[in-house]
C-alpha cells in the first residue's frame, strides 16, 4: 500500500454575523494563505452565521451579497447557522445559495416532507489532488420549533453526524 503524504491547510470562518467591516481583512488573509500554500491543498469553510440581517447590505440583498463575498473569497464549503435558517423566509433561504460557487453541507436539514433541498448536501467527500479523502460534515443547531414554522425540519444533530 502506497503512503500518501500531503500538507492540507484548513481555514474557517464562523459567526461573522454580517460584521462586514472586517471582511476586507478576512478576504486578504485567505487570499494570501492560498497564494502562500499554492503547492499544498487548502480548504476554506464558513461554519455558519455569516448572514445576519442587522446589516443593511445583508438585509438589502437578503443574504445574497454575503454569498457573493464567499464566492469572491473562493470558499469551498459552508453550512448554515440559525441566522441563515430562521431569519429568512422559506423562499428566501431556498434561493439564498442559487449563485453559490461552494457547496452547502447540512446533515440534519430537510423540508417538512423530508426532502433534502436542492442546495444542500448532507456530507461531502473532498478529494485532494494527491488522492487524500476528507469527509466534510456539518449540522445546524436544533431550533426545530422555529424552523418548522418556516417550513423546514431539523433532525437531532448528533445522530445525523454519526450516521
Where are these regions (language model features)?
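Acidic, metal/ion-coordinating pockets
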Residues: 1-163
Amino acid at each position: 500500500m502506497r503512503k500518501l503524504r500531503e500538507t492540507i491547510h484548513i481555514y474557517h470562518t464562523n459567526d461573522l454575523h454580517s460584521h462586514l467591516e472586517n471582511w476586507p481583512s478576512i478576504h486578504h488573509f485567505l487570499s494570501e494563505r492560498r497564494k502562500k500554500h499554492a503547492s499544498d491543498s487548502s480548504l476554506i469553510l464558513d461554519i455558519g452565521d455569516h448572514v445576519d440581517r442587522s446589516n443593511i447590505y445583508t438585509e438589502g440583498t437578503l443574504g445574497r451579497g454575503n454569498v457573493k463575498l464567499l464566492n469572491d473569497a473562493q470558499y469551498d464549503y459552508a453550512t448554515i447557522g440559525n441566522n441563515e435558517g430562521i431569519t429568512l423566509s422559506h423562499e428566501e433561504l431556498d434561493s439564498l445559495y442559487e449563485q453559490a460557487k461552494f457547496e452547502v453541507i447540512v446533515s440534519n436539514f430537510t423540508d417538512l416532507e423530508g426532502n433534502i433541498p436542492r442546495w444542500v448536501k448532507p456530507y461531502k467527500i473532498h478529494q485532494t489532488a494527491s488522492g487524500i479523502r476528507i469527509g466534510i460534515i456539518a449540522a445546524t443547531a436544533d431550533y426545530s420549533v422555529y424552523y418548522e414554522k418556516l417550513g423546514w425540519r431539523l433532525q437531532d444533530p448528533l445522530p445525523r453526524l454519526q450516521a
